[in-house]
Amino acid sequence: MASLKEIDTRIKSTKKMKQITKAMNMVSSSKLRRAEKNTKQFTPYMDKMQDAITAVAGASSNTNHPMLRPRKITRSGYLVITSDKGLAGAYSANVLKKLITDIEAKHQDSSEYGIVVLGQQGVDFLKNRGYDIEYSQVDVPDQPSFKSVQALANHAIDLYSEEEIDELNIYYSHYVSVLENKPTSRQVLPLSQEDSSKGHGHLSSYEFEPDKESILSVILPQYVESLIYGTILDAKASEHATRMTAMKNATDNATELIDDLSLEYNRARQAEITQQITEIVGGSAALE
């Protein structure tokens, strides 16, 4: 049995750890509320961008912009969104596991794909396993602005525009609720022309200046940038929710451990007192 001093030391250290995890839980809760607000505020902008794409691409059935035109896939691109920090449960690990599983299933050689990474956790994971990273960005703010991730989005888009890759897939953790997030992947490029033209066929009567292709060459890259940014906002909400849950579980576990240690301390203390009383009684009997 551990000594009273050892048990007391463990109780004190666990209480300190509980204070830290409780504070981190509260901080993550605050960050989650802001992330949810950011995502909600960004949605109307994405809706308007969708309308703009629909108005132009949907006005003609023969739009031939490279971002809307599928081509033979000889090299795939993967944009993976992870966290910079740990203490977020399996947030990054689940996304990276899904990425690696898909890469191993689809490709025989590293020349068949390129990886762009957001987040230190993803960079470390992939480098430690020998994967080449074409571009990475770390130290992303907890509430990222569009400008803070624009370089990453532009690089991923340039890989497709310059035909270094023939498709761009994004891997991230989709925020469902505080208690649920889902490792998700979806194709970003080429854009689905069917999706970009659905629901607004009556806009074909519009006239465009200078012409549809010139307009698309401007708004399509902006639209893809917005898709990537919106996905990052979604992933950040998932990260904060996962970390908040992890810190709550850690706090609850610390509380349970403190209770168990306190019970062990009281039992050890009682045994020590009983032994002292027994020794005193035994000593008194010996003197009689």
UniProtKB/Swiss-Prot annotation:
It is found in: Cell membrane. GO terms for molecular function: ATP binding; proton-transporting ATP synthase activity, rotational mechanism. Keywords: ATP synthesis, Cell membrane, CF(1), Hydrogen ion transport, Ion transport, Membrane, Transport. It is a peripheral membrane protein. CDD domains: F1-ATPase_gamma. InterPro entries: ATP_synth_F1_ATPase_gsu (IPR035968), ATP_synth_F1_gsu (IPR000131). GO terms for cellular component: plasma membrane; proton-transporting ATP synthase complex. It comes from the Bacteria. Pfam families: ATP-synt. GO terms for biological process: proton motive force-driven plasma membrane ATP synthesis. SUPFAM superfamilies: ATP synthase (F1-ATPase), gamma subunit. The keyword Kinase does not apply. Produces ATP from ADP in the presence of a proton gradient across the membrane. The gamma chain is believed to be important in regulating ATPase activity and the flow of protons through the CF(0) complex. Belongs to the ATPase gamma chain family. F-type ATPases have 2 components, CF(1) - the catalytic core - and CF(0) - the membrane proton channel. CF(1) has five subunits: alpha(3), beta(3), gamma(1), delta(1), epsilon(1). CF(0) has three main subunits: a, b and c. This is ATP synthase gamma chain. It comes from Staphylococcus aureus (strain bovine RF122 / ET3-1). The lineage of its organism: Bacteria, Bacillati, Bacillota, Bacilli, Bacillales.
